[in-house]
């Protein structure tokens, strides 16, 4: 008969287990990861706070460490150092160029690091990370314009897909304006290639025969491009573009304004393909009472609507003065407003160049505007027939200002990137100024009075 309340007999070889405290957990088994040579059979329990009589562990049983900053490895990896080095080379070149300008006295001096090593050592993590992002943005800007350029970095076209092409050529006598006009057509910088070229002068007899032959040869040259295996490929729908010389008085005849008139010589040519109108030595005629501004804004759209084959309309006007006083009919003023391109000879009078640059560089920093004026001054001292071109509606912002060199071709000036780099120089200047101000304040506070 079993006795109530008696504990059952313990099993053989079983040790008595002490009764656990109600507020304590059961004893844990030995940890999994232990050194086998120094494994303790009965490791001591981890020291902890007494849970107290309530049996609940306090909320602050395990003391938490204060938040620690994340461990950082090297401040800059290899790619970041490459970005900073590449950007530093550009910044150093721009800074030296600005300091060497004759007009550098009017610019605010910018503080900068003495060398690349000083920048990498003392720049600080925040500034260096900012420079890395800025150089990545510069690379993106260069990659965006790369499809519009040839392999040598020159522009493949002056207008690309822009239509109509209304351009003004500014230059004094003897600067090569006539040669520039022929080169634009022969080098296929105007697209599409015109099939008919109208050369308009005050009088037909004043055009020398040698110049007429040069026009005929160069527009024929511009109609072909080299092909494979020594072949040539026509660039238009004709094998020989037409060259038509006209007097200015024939241009302003009434029937030449009406595209539906069968006597309109421009409509007849537009029915066959693209056309180009060249006005040379006509500045005095344009300043007269007869208005011809229709050729700059209304006439192109009418030709495009009526003649689908006329896929290109180009008007290039030569002016000897950037601001002529005589403009009774407003032709020159309307021409400047409608013009998409301004081709400027660096040999123009400096006062006229400065006025033009001040007008069309409102969005650029003052330093870049002065740099552009210095570029004009530099090319004016050379004997080459260089031209600087301003495009009001460029295919890309980097192509807004270009220069045309007889050997290098049409090269973009990248003034947008130069402006971006100048803003980076200003950022470095502000950072160094802040550090100097903080250092002065710290020394003033620590210096005993």
Swiss-Prot record:
Null allele phenotype: Empty capsids are produced in the absence of packaging protein 1.
Places the protein is found: Virion; Host nucleus, Host nucleoplasm; Host nucleus, Host nucleolus
UniProt xrefs under InterPro entries: Adeno_IVa2, P-loop_NTPase
Reported induction: Expressed in the intermediate phase of the viral replicative cycle.
Region (DNA-binding): 440-449
Keyword RNA-binding (UniProt): no
Single GO term (MF): DNA binding
Keywords, comma-separated and alphabetical: Activator, ATP-binding, DNA-binding, Host nucleus, Nucleotide-binding, Phosphoprotein, Transcription, Transcription regulation, Viral genome packaging, Viral release from host cell, Virion
Residue numbers spanned by region Disordered: 1-77
Main localization, broad class: virion
Pfam families: Adeno_IVa2
One GO CC term on file: host cell nucleoplasm
Protein role: Component of the packaging machinery which encapsidates the viral DNA into preformed capsids and transcriptional activator of the viral major late promoter (MLP). Binds, along with packaging proteins 2 and 3, to the specific packaging sequence on the left end of viral genomic DNA and displays ATPase activity thereby providing the power stroke of the packaging machinery. The activity of packaging protein IVa2 is stimulated by protein 33K which acts as a terminase. May be the protein that pumps DNA into the capsid powered by ATP hydrolysis.
Record text on subunit structure and interactions: Homodimer. Part of a genome packaging complex composed of packaging proteins 1, 2 and 3; this complex specifically binds to the packaging sequence on the left end of viral genomic DNA and performs packaging of the viral genome. Interacts with protein 33K.
The protein's name: Packaging protein 1
Gene source species: Human adenovirus C serotype 2
Encoding gene per record: IVa2
């Amino acid at each position: 008969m079993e006795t109530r309340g008696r504990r059952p007999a313990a099993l053989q070889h079983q040790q008595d287990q002490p009764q656990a405290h109600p507020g304590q957990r059961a004893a844990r088994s030995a940890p999994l990861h232990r050194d086998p040579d120094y494994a303790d059979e009965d490791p001591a329990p981890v020291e902890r706070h007494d849970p107290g009589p309530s049996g609940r562990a306090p909320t602050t049983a395990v003391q938490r460490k204060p938040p620690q900053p994340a461990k950082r490895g090297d401040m800059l990896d290899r790619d970041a150092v490459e970005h900073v080095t590449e950007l530093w080379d550009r910044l150093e070149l721009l800074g030296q160029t600005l300091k060497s300008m004759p007009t550098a006295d009017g610019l605010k001096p910018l503080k900068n690091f003495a060398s690349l090593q000083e920048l990498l050592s003392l720049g600080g993590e925040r500034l260096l990370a900012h420079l890395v992002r800025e150089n990545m943005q510069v690379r993106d800007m260069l990659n965006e314009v790369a499809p519009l350029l040839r392999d040598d970095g020159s522009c493949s076209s002056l207008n690309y897909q822009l239509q109509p092409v209304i351009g003004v050529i500014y230059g004094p006598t003897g600067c090569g304006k006539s040669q520039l006009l022929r080169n634009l057509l022969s080098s296929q910088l105007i697209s599409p290639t015109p099939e008919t070229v109208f050369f308009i002068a005050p009088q037909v007899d004043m055009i020398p025969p040698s110049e007429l032959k040069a026009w005929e040869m160069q527009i024929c040259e511009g109609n072909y491009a080299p092909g494979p295996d020594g072949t040539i490929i026509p660039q238009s729908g004709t094998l020989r573009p037409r060259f038509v010389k006209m007097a200015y008085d024939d241009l302003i005849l009434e029937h030449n304004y009406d595209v539906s008139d069968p006597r309109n010589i421009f409509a007849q040519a537009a029915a066959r393909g693209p056309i180009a109108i060249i006005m040379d030595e006509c500045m005095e005629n344009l300043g007269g009472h007869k208005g011809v501004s229709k050729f700059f804004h209304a006439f192109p759209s009418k030709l495009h609507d009526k003649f689908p084959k006329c896929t290109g309309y180009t008007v290039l006007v030569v002016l000897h003065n950037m601001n002529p006083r005589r403009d009774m009919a407003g032709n020159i003023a309307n021409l400047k407003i409608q013009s998409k391109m301004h081709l400027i000879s660096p040999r123009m009078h400096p006062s006229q160049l400065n006025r033009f640059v001040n007008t069309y560089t409102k969005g650029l920093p003052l330093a870049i505007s002065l740099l552009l004026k210095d570029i004009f001054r530099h090319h004016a001292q050379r004997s080459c027939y260089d031209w600087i071109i301003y495009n009001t509606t460029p295919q890309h912002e980097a192509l807004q200002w270009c220069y045309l060199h007889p050997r290098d071709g049409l090269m973009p000036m990248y003034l947008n990137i130069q402006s971006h780099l100048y803003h980076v120089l200003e950022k470095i200047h502000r950072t160094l100024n802040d550090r100097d101000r903080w250092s002065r304040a710290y020394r003033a506070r620590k210096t005993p009075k």
